[in-house]
Amino acid sequence: MKKNLTLLLTFYFLLLTTLSYSQSTIRPVSWAKQINLPPFYNLYKVDEFVYRSEQPTKEGMKALDSLGIKSILSLRNILTDKLAAKDTKLTLCQYRINTWTITYEEVVASLRILINVDKPTLVHCKHGSDRTGCIIAAYRMAVQNWSKEDAIKEFREGGYGFHEEWFENILILLEKIDIDQMKAELGLIK
């Protein structure tokens, strides 16, 4: 009897551990899907029109061109994509953002570009995590009608590399966004 009880409890514990582990590793289907396209390590498809990644290399730009990406929105503060994209048909856009001091106005201006360029579009910064994550979270709220909570959850937990210990300012900015005001400024509310 004691042996059976021990076996039963052991089985029960293993079952609970397995279930809790598998539930914690399930990625919501609405979150961006990782794309395996060398040389990228942080390339995701947000929706049929928008992708996100780290800084593309020259090889990366060619791969994006072959994938059918039409436009690139760089959020890099210093570097441009001109040299890397030289031998492609990609349309290059740049909106320079400093990660430490990103403002609501910069988010809206970046979204305005993203909404109006030829699609599909890739949004990137250096690592594809902080500035890119902020703009994609705002895109989720303004264009895809996500709740603020869901957009921030994906931003923080999506595996894109958000540096929360350094850039809490981005979380504060996203928390303060008035979604209806942002939609109105972008012409998304009639």
Regions found by a protein language model. Give the residues of each.
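Substrate/cofactor-recognition hotspot
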Residues: 128
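Cys-dependent protein tyrosine phosphatase-like superfamily
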Residues: 20-121, 134-190
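Short cysteine clusters
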Residues: 125
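Bacterial N-terminal signal peptides that target proteins for export
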Residues: 1-9
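Bacterial N-terminal signal peptides
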Residues: 8-20
